[in-house]
Amino acid sequence: MTAANLLEFDLDALAAFCEQLGEKRFRATQLFRWIHQKGQSDFAQMSDLAKSLREKLAGRAVVRPLAVLSEHVSADGTVKWLFDVGGGNAVETVFIPENDRGTLCISSQAGCAVGCRFCSTGHQGFSRNLSTGEIVAQLWHAEHQLRARLGTTERVISNVVMMGMGEPLQNYAALLPALRVMLDDHGYGLSRRRVTVSTSGVVPMIDRLREDCPVALAVSLHAPTDALRDDLVPLNRKYPIAELLEACQRYLEAAPRDFITFEYCMLDGVNDSEAQARELLRLVGERGPVGRVPCKINLIPFNPFPASGLTRSSVARVQAFAQLLVDGGLVTTVRRTRGDDIDAACGQLAGEVQDRTNAQARMRRAPIAIRPIDSAVQRRADAAPSGSATETTR
């Protein structure tokens, strides 16, 4: 009989497993704490469990971590791990330290089928979904390794963002139990406000998440019009912007925050003009297709990679774009790039993927031909003073 990997179970599933062993629910709670709060994988070391239970577990269960293929530490303290998930696939996980928090960026798939043109993961194609245990194992490894390295028993990771490799909402069956493990007070005890699911816009699953486990939501918007977003985020052809914004409004009815974060990767000459900033203001404002959408805009400097055919907007252009949004009444932040010296910044995670979607071949086609920005607009943007928008990290 194959041993059950206990990292696959949320507390309810672990309780059901313990009942199959003839044990009561409180034993599952004890076991859950040992695994997730103390990082213990050896049942023999779980001293407050009955010896009979430890013997049962030794024959029928295991806490199976992911094998670490590599670890890189950036000059700014960012840490990137490459984990082997079998079948020739590897996924990446990134820890971003800050003075007031520690954020872990977790992958949900080996590769990604969405194929956003500015994302290195999308250019790698898609192999498979990760299991709940493979998602949780990234947090388990990072939290307990960082504690050991820092010589502390206090929690190191305060925030989790599902912004690594993959589209989380296209792996919902594995994502949901993983979120419950993160939020459980007997597990990692994270606040719903501090766990963020980022999606390219899988509308039906946004509604499911609202019903099942509403956490903070970030939406990869990246364009103010369907015509442009169809090319940058191909999923838009199935779920256009108006449908996506309606789903965001519904989500806010149950969300732990009173706004949606819209992520907007700044691409030189593609989506960064003054006119497009004004279109974005209109899109989420009272006169937009679904009325006002309470939101924060997070502008993300593009992290170039050769296959994209795209380049990063200038600092001045980003500042000018941000200032127009701020002047229009939108809370706007500019993400500060972290870990780019180890390819751990936003959009750079690629891992190693056995592509089943032929994405690498499809991505070789030329990017969409975008009309150049008016030269006068270009000069004004490049000469613009620093905006008042704030900086954020991932």
Swiss-Prot record:
Residues annotated as binding S-adenosyl-L-methionine are: 166-167, 198, 220-222, 303
Task: Write down how the cofactor binds this protein.
Answer: Binds 1 [4Fe-4S] cluster. The cluster is coordinated with 3 cysteines and an exchangeable S-adenosyl-L-methionine.
- Which cellular compartments is it found in? Cytoplasm
Question: Which cofactor does this sequence's record say it needs?
Answer: [4Fe-4S] cluster
SUPFAM superfamilies linked? Radical SAM enzymes (SSF102114)
Q: Looking at the record, which segments are called Disordered?
A: 374-394
Which biological process annotations from GO are given for this protein?
rRNA base methylation; tRNA methylation
Q: What CDD domains does this protein map onto? A: Radical_SAM
EC number annotated for this UniProt entry? 2.1.1.192
State the family named in the UniProt similarity comment for this chain. Belongs to the radical SAM superfamily. RlmN family.
Please report the name of this protein according to its UniProt entry.
Dual-specificity RNA methyltransferase RlmN
User: What species was this sequence derived from?
Assistant: Methylibium petroleiphilum (strain ATCC BAA-1232 / LMG 22953 / PM1)
